[in-house]
């Protein structure tokens, strides 16, 4: 049995296949297993909370895990070690989520590939190798254009009294949140990035409001400036996007691309299905 796992910051999608890779046997989820966010010694425990995975833990022979926070070798080793505790008989490959995005959006030609979900990232994928210009610095210093960045922007504008009255009243009614509660959640609780990203729901439900359209537009501009324009060939190749934020705000995303005279290619909401197809075509053949 083979497992292919797409691990975002908030959740991991698991797909289990027959050993020949042709038939899907199970689809399930765990929480996100980002080693920069979750305590390392809790990774195995979180996997073990899924009864479907525990039931087949001795039957898995290969696990292809692609995870947020797995861009550094040290983090790859940590995640691999924790997964191995749960699946002792499996041969495990751990790669960063950007690799999964590149595979999921691959159309047979070189392209810039971007993640816009809870967090954000980018690379150039030539069909064989990922080429990165810049690191991903996480929600504290980076993640421009992401769900956490959009959530942070709308929360900040609410507390700093920048939101128009209609939006401020709706935000107040929806969350009844004090500054003290916000600070506690962000600075003294785990998964602050996911907490900030949860406010994106407020924006997405009102994305046609002019103020929020501009808020998202500015966040997307920041993403392009930090994560796309540094690639010298960004004007000559397609730019593919993976993740819920790129899907929800695709009209605004395309407007920003047009502003910079760039060409948007594929937009993939959930990469797991395309990731499985990529493995079946190129890796498990």
Please identify what each model-predicted range represents.
Residues 35, 69, 136-143, 262-266:
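A short glycine/serine-rich beta->alpha loop
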Residues 64-71:
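Polybasic, low-complexity association/targeting segments
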Residues 71-166:
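Phosphate-binding/catalytic loop of phosphoryl-transfer enzymes
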Residues 1-63, 82, 105-112, 155-285:
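ATP-binding/phosphotransfer module of carbohydrate and carboxylate kinases, centering on a glycine-rich
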Residues 8, 15, 68, 99, ...:
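Anionic group-transfer/hydrolysis microenvironments
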């Amino acid at each position: 049995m083979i497992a292919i796992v797409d691990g975002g910051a908030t959740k991991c999608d698991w797909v289990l296949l027959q050993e020949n890779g042709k038939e899907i046997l199970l689809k399930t989820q765990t929480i996100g297993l980002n080693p920069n966010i979750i305590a390392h010694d809790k990774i195995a425990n979180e996997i073990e909370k899924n009864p479907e995975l525990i039931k087949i833990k001795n039957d898995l022979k290969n696990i292809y895990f692609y995870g947020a926070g797995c861009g550094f070798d040290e983090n790859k080793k940590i995640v691999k070690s924790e997964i191995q505790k749960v699946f002792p008989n499996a041969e495990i490959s751990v790669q960063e989520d950007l690799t999964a995005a590149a595979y999921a959006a691959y159309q047979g030609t070189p392209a810039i590939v971007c993640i816009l979900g809870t967090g954000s990232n980018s690379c150039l994928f030539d069909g064989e190798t990922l080429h990165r210009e810049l690191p991903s610095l996480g929600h504290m210093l980076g993640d421009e254009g992401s769900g956490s960045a959009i959530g942070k922007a709308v929360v900040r504008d609410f507390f700093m009294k920048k939101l128009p009255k209609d939006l401020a009243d709706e935000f107040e009614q929806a969350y009844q949140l004090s500054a003290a509660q916000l600070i506690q959640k962000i600075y003294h609780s785990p998964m602050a990035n996911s907490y900030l990203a949860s406010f994106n729901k407020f924006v997405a439900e009102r994305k046609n409001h002019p103020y929020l359209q501009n808020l998202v537009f500015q966040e997307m501009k920041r993403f392009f400036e930090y994560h796309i324009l540094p690639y010298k060939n960004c004007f000559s190749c397609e730019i593919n996007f993976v993740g819920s934020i790129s899907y929800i705000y695709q009209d605004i995303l395309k407007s920003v691309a047009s502003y910079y005279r760039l060409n948007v290619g594929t937009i993939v909401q959930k990469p797991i299905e395309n990731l499985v197809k990529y493995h079946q075509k190129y890796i498990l053949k």
